[in-house]
A protein has these predicted regions:
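Residue-level preference for alpha-helix termini and adjacent loops
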Residues: 15-17, 42, 47, 111, ...
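Glycine/proline-rich loop-helix segments at beta-alpha junctions forming the active-site rim
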Residues: 49-159
Length: 159
C-alpha cells in the first residue's frame, strides 16, 4: 500500500496517482516500473486527501482532514492482504504512526526499521524536497537500498 498526501494539480487533472515528477522519483526510489507500480493486484494507492487542496506559500496545501476521517477506514477494510505500507510524507506518517512517530519527519525516516514490517516512512518525493535530500545524504545511501530490497522481496521481484 502506498499512502501519499493529496494529489497535485497534474494528478488531479489526469486522475492518475503519482503521474508527475514526484511519482517518477517514487518509482525510482522503489525500483518499480510503471507496469508494476500501477498493477492493482500488487499495489494499492490511497492518498490522505482525494482532491487537490490548492496552493499555499511553500507549495501545495496539506490534505483536507475530512477525507481521511471519512474514507480511509472504509478503503482499508477492502484491502485485507497489505504486507507493507509506504507512508509518504509527514501527514501520512502522523496519521498512521501517531505517537510512535518521532519528533520530525527526518527522525521518523531515519528510524524506518522501527516501523517494519508494517510501515516504511519516506519523505515526499517532490522536487520541492531536493534541499532535504541534499541535507540528508544518508537517505540515498542507506534508506533507499533497504526500501528497494523490502519492495522487491514483498513483490517477488529481482532487485
Amino acid at each position: 500500500l502506498i499512502v501519499g498526501q493529496a494529489p497535485g494539480i497534474r494528478v488531479h487533472n489526469t486522475g492518475i496517482p503519482w503521474n508527475d515528477p514526484s511519482g517518477d522519483r517514487l518509482r525510482h526510489w522503489t525500483n518499480l516500473d510503471k507496469k508494476t507500480f500501477y498493477d492493482i493486484n500488487q499495489i494499492a494507492i490511497i492518498p490522505m486527501g482525494f482532491c487537490y487542496p490548492g496552493t499555499g506559500p511553500s507549495g501545495d496545501l496539506p490534505p483536507r482532514k475530512e477525507c481521511a476521517s471519512l474514507w480511509l477506514a472504509k478503503l482499508l477494510a477492502g484491502l485485507p492482504n497489505i504486507q507493507l505500507t509506504l507512508l509518504i510524507g509527514q501527514y501520512a506518517q502522523q496519521h498512521y504512526l501517531g505517537k510512535q512517530a518521532k519528533t520530525n519527519l527526518t527522525q521518523t525516516v531515519a528510524s524506518f526499521a522501527d516501523y517494519l514490517p508494517t510501515y516504511f516512512p519516506l519523505p515526499h518525493p517532490s522536487p520541492r524536497n531536493n534541499i532535504w535530500l541534499k541535507r540528508n545524504p544518508w537517505f540515498e545511501k542507506f534508506i533507499l537500498p533497504a526500501l528497494r530490497i523490502t519492495c522487491s522481496t514483498i513483490l517477488s521481484i529481482t532487485p
